[in-house]
């Protein structure tokens, strides 16, 4: 317990927060071990990089850097409205979809409320919950995914928000659209359902829910998506939320002005219209997933079936130890003990060459433990 008087000034929820730990940066491992040619399969980034159209849009915007960006993101909202057939008034732009999760908590949740989510769910959910002083209600998982029946039972008069990621991170589990919509339709209208679809583009088309069409039926639904994953713009930090116009208006009241820089706005608009690059990204992910799963079969390892651009593999021993051994070989993956999965590692899908380097390194390590 820190007894410093300045520490005591912080809100109780902030004092108890465990900071989010991101995947290790390549530069950090270079500094620590003096390695080169490091590959990073830790943060579910796009191994093909951003769309060439996005890069061109950034270059065309550089001359205007002395100016403030459009604080309302007019052009990007218009592009999103056209692509997804929703009203611009239903769109909220965020500095990554993570900011939207924080805006939702700040807008709707206070210390007397509860926020419900699943075990093995994205680490930002407890962070934004604790930051506003609310109580996190963590529901046991079903086969590493969401148990919607258990979540229903966990909802009380104090529940204000339910977070559901589909696919879930870090497990990759996917809920069927009809099952998910049935759950949302049963929710009390006083409970906000946040459907986190950061990995939506990687879901096989036949399994993609028509979730945006639900917005007209469920005024308590918010859907968040991001440009960080399939669109390859993680370094620019931009995402968007879709909801009723009323919810969007409320979120925009607490959103910081100019929360999206002009490079991000221009790149996101261009990336949204580069269908060829998105298709290449999805195809690379499908092929890479198959490559990794074939490798796991060869090593007689189990994994959690994933609908995202990552897969969590069960090593049947300390994931942290294997993670550290991989670092020595210049391969960065993601330990997930903080998600109560101490024997798993989460592997982002890379290029064919990156995937093979990882599999070769893993095989060599497992041969000596």
Regions found by a protein language model. Give the residues of each.
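PLP-dependent aminotransferase-like
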Residues: 107-164
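PLP-dependent enzyme catalytic core of the Aspartate aminotransferase-like
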Residues: 325-329, 333-334, 338-369
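Phosphate-binding glycine-rich loop
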Residues: 66-114, 132
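PLP-dependent aminotransferase class I/II
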Residues: 51, 72, 220-304
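N-terminal "arm"/small-domain region of PLP-dependent enzymes with the aminotransferase-like
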Residues: 2-67
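Short acidic capping loops at alpha-helix termini that bridge into adjacent secondary structure
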Residues: 37, 87-91, 111-114, 158, ...
């Amino acid at each position: 317990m820190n007894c410093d008087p300045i520490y005591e000034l912080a809100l109780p929820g902030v004092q108890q927060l465990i900071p989010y730990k991101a995947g290790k940066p390549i530069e950090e491992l270079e500094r620590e071990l003096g390695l080169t040619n490091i590959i990073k399969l830790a943060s579910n980034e796009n191994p093909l990089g951003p769309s060439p159209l996005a890069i061109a849009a950034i270059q065309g915007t550089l001359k205007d850097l002395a100016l403030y960006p459009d604080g309302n993101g007019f052009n990007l909202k218009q592009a999103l409205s056209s692509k997804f057939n929703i009203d611009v008034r239903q769109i909220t732009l965020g500095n990554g979809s993570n900011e939207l999760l924080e805006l939702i908590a700040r807008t709707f949740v206070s210390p007397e409320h509860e926020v419900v989510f699943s075990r093995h769910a994205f680490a930002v959910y407890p962070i934004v919950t604790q930051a506003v002083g609310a109580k996190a209600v963590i529901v046991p998982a079903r086969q590493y995914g969401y148990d919607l029946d258990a979540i229903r039972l966990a909802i009380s008069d104090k529940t204000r928000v339910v977070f559901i990621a589909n696919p879930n991170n870090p497990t990759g589990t996917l809920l069927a659209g009809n099952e998910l919509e049935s759950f949302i339709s049963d929710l009390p209208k006083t409970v906000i359902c946040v459907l986190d679809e950061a990995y939506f583009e990687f879901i096989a088309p036949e399994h993609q829910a028509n979730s945006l069409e639900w917005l007209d039926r469920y005024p308590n639904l918010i859907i968040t998506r991001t440009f960080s994953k399939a669109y390859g713009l993680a370094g620019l930090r931009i995402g968007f939320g879709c909801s009723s116009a009323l919810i969007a208006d409320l979120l925009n009241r607490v959103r910081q002005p100019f929360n999206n820089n002009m490079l991000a706005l221009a790149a996101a608009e261009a990336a949204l219209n580069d269908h060829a690059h998105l298709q290449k990204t999805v195809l690379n992910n499908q092929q890479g997933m198959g490559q990794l799963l074939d490798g796991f079969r060869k090593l007689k390892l189990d994994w959690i079936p994933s609908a995202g651009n990552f897969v969590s593999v069960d090593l049947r021993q300390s994931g942290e130890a294997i993670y550290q051994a991989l670092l020595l070989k210049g391969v960065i993956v993601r330990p997930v003990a903080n998600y109560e999965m101490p024997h798993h590692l989460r592997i982002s899908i890379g290029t064919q060459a990156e995937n093979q380097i990882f599999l070769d390194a893993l095989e060599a390590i497992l041969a000596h433990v």
